[in-house]
C-alpha cells in the first residue's frame, strides 16, 4: 500500500485557533500527492510540497518567514533512493515553488545544489 506523509512545520506559533484550516490544507497536500502518485513517488512528493509552498499557513513558499531585510529566501531539496539521486536549491528569491527547481537540479544531474 502506498504511503505519503506531509509535515506542516513546527515552531512557536499557536496554531490551535487555525487547526481546522491547517488540517484542510494538509489534506489538500496529501490529495495532490496521491493524485500525482501515478507518475511515481517523486511526482507525489513534489505535488504535495507545492501545495504547502502555495499556502500562506506554512513556512514554505508563500508563507515563508521573512529575512531581516524583509525579503524571502527559500530552500528546497528532493531525493530519490534509486540511484542515490538528489537535487537542492538554497536562497531562492523569485520563484514560487523551489521544489520544482530542486527537482530540475536533480534531473539535470550535473550538480546536487
Question: Where do the PLM segments sit?
Answer:
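Alpha/propeptide regions of enzymes that mature by internal proteolysis
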Residues: 1-113
